[in-house]
Amino acid sequence: MTNYAIILAAGKGTRMTSDLPKVLHKVSGLTMLEHVFRSVKAINPEKAVTVIGHKSEMVRAVLADQSAFVHQTEQLGTGHAVMMAETQLEGLEGHTLVIAGDTPLITGESLKSLIDFHVNHKNVATILTATAPDPFGYGRIVRNKDGEVIKIVEQKDANEYEQQLKEINTGTYVFDNKRLFEALKCITTNNAQGEYYLTDVVAIFRANKEKVGAYILRDFNESLGVNDRVALATAETVMRQRITQKHMVNGVTFHNPETVYIESDVTIAPDVLIEGNVTLKGRTHIGSGTVLTNGTYIVDSEIGDNCVVTNSMIESSVLAAGVTVGPYAHLRPGTTLDREVHIGNFVEVKGSHIGEKTKAGHLTYIGNAQVGSSVNVGAGTITVNYDGQNKYETVVGDHAFIGSNSTLIAPLEIGDNALTAAGSTISKTVPADSIVIGRSRQVTKEGYAKRLAHHPSRSK
C-alpha cells in the first residue's frame, strides 16, 4: 500500500491578526505545521507535498527537505489548493491524505486508523469526521438511510435540516490518488463563496456510484482547526494536558499539573517530582529522581539524575547527577556542572565548566571560567571576564579556596590548593598551594571619628 500526503499551508490566517503565517504559530513549542507533519509521518507517506502561498519561504524553511512544495498564488479554496499538487502526484497509484496545516491536535494514531478504514472498506474517498457539540461553522456530513455519505454541505450552503446535523467534516480526507485528480477537473465555483470546494468531489464520486465513507474521530478535540488566537489558546490547553498526562503515565509526579508548561520535545525520566509553575522548553531532558520546585524555568538543557533545582533559571546547560541549584540562581548558555556541584542563591554562571563537588553558595558571578573539583567559591566572588571588547577566561584549580568578595580579573589562573584572602582583587597567576592577599592593609585611627560631621558629639 503506497500512501501520499498533501498538507494545505498556503493561507495567511487573517483572523490571527499577525504578520506570521497562520501555520507557523506555535503550540507547545512547535509550529502547528510541525505538529501536523509529525502526525502525517505516522502513515509513512512515499511523498509529502506541502501547498504554500503566503510568506512561502518562511513556511518552506520549517519543513525544508522533508517535503516537496507547490505554490498556490491565489487562494481560491481547498479544491484549488489540492489542484496545485497535481504536478507532483497525478497518475500515481495509491492513497492520498489531504490535511490542513492548522490542525495541530490531530494524532498519528488517528491518521493511521483513517487510512486503514479507507483501505479495508475499499473506498474511493474517506472523510475524517467528528461529532461536534456545536456544529455551527462546520461543513455537515449528510448520509442516506443506510448510513452512506451522500455529500458534505458547507455552513453557508446548508438548509435548515442540514444545519441541525452534528456530524461535521474535519477537513481531513483520504482519496484514491488517481480518482482525486480526475474528479478535481470537474468541480466548479458555483457556491456561496465562489471557490473550488474540495468537498465537491464527494458528490462527483457519488454520481458515479463510487464508494465514499466516513471515519468518526473518538476525540472531538483532534478536529480543532486554529483560525484565531482563541482557538490557539484552546489548542495549547489541550496539548498541555496531553503532555502532562503522558509524563504522569510514565512515572512523573506533578503537584499542580494545570500550572506547568512543558513543550513537546521535553523528555522526563521516571520518579521526577515537579512542583507548580515550572516551565520546561525546547530539547530539555530531566533525569530520574530530580526535583524541580515552584517557579523553575529550564530551556534546552540536560539535567542529570537526583538533582534539585529550586526556583531557578537554566538555559542551554548540562548538569550531572546530584547537582543542586538555587534558589534564585541563573545558569546561562554554555554552563556545565559536574557531579554534586552546588550553585546557591543569587549565583549566575555563564559559559563555564565547574568540577565535581565545587560549591558557590551565594551572590557570585562565574563567567567564562574553568573551575576544578572541590573548590569553595566564597560569597560575593566575581570573575571579571569582559574588557568592553573581548571575553577572557579564568582557570581555578582543584581544591582551591576563593575567599568571600574576591574579584578575579581575567585572563587569570589560580593553581590547585591555592587560597585567596577575602576581599582580594587578583589579576596575576596564583601558583598551586599559595595564599594570595590582594587588598590594602587595614589602618585604624582611634578617636578620629569624633572629628567627622556624622558623629553624635558634633551635633551638640
UniProtKB/Swiss-Prot annotation:
First and last residue of the signal peptide: none
Record-level Gene Ontology MF annotations: glucosamine-1-phosphate N-acetyltransferase activity; magnesium ion binding; UDP-N-acetylglucosamine diphosphorylase activity
EC number: 2.7.7.23, 2.3.1.157
Record: active site: H362
Binding site for acetyl-CoA: A379, N385, Y386, S404, A422, R439
InterPro entries named among the record's database cross-references: Bifunctional_GlmU (IPR005882), GlmU-like (IPR050065), GlmU_C_LbH (IPR038009), Hexapep (IPR001451), NTP_transferase_dom (IPR005835), Nucleotide-diphossugar_trans (IPR029044), Trimer_LpxA-like_sf (IPR011004)
Free-text remark on how the cofactor is bound: Binds 1 Mg(2+) ion per subunit.
Gene3D superfamilies, alphabetized: Hexapeptide repeat proteins (2.160.10.10), Spore Coat Polysaccharide Biosynthesis Protein SpsA, Chain A (3.90.550.10)
GO cellular component: cytoplasm; membrane
Known cofactor(s): Mg(2+)
Catalytic activity line of the entry: alpha-D-glucosamine 1-phosphate + acetyl-CoA = N-acetyl-alpha-D-glucosamine 1-phosphate + CoA + H(+); N-acetyl-alpha-D-glucosamine 1-phosphate + UTP + H(+) = UDP-N-acetyl-alpha-D-glucosamine + diphosphate
Keywords annotated in UniProt: Acyltransferase, Cell shape, Cell wall biogenesis/degradation, Cytoplasm, Magnesium, Metal-binding, Multifunctional enzyme, Nucleotidyltransferase, Peptidoglycan synthesis, Repeat, Transferase
Binding of UDP-N-acetyl-alpha-D-glucosamine, residues: 8-11, 22, 72, 77-78, 139, 154, 169, 227, 332, 350, 365, 376
Amino-acid positions noted as binding Mg(2+) in the UniProt annotation, renumbered to this chain: D102, N227
One Gene Ontology term from the biological process aspect of the record: cell morphogenesis
Region described as Pyrophosphorylase: spans on this chain: 1-229
Pfam families, per the entry: Hexapep, NTP_transferase
Compartments reported by the entry: Cytoplasm
Annotated spans, N-acetyltransferase: 251-460
Summary of subunit composition and partner proteins: Homotrimer.
Protein role: Catalyzes the last two sequential reactions in the de novo biosynthetic pathway for UDP-N-acetylglucosamine (UDP-GlcNAc). The C-terminal domain catalyzes the transfer of acetyl group from acetyl coenzyme A to glucosamine-1-phosphate (GlcN-1-P) to produce N-acetylglucosamine-1-phosphate (GlcNAc-1-P), which is converted into UDP-GlcNAc by the transfer of uridine 5-monophosphate (from uridine 5-triphosphate), a reaction catalyzed by the N-terminal domain.
UniProt similarity note: In the N-terminal section; belongs to the N-acetylglucosamine-1-phosphate uridyltransferase family.
Name of the featured protein: Bifunctional protein GlmU
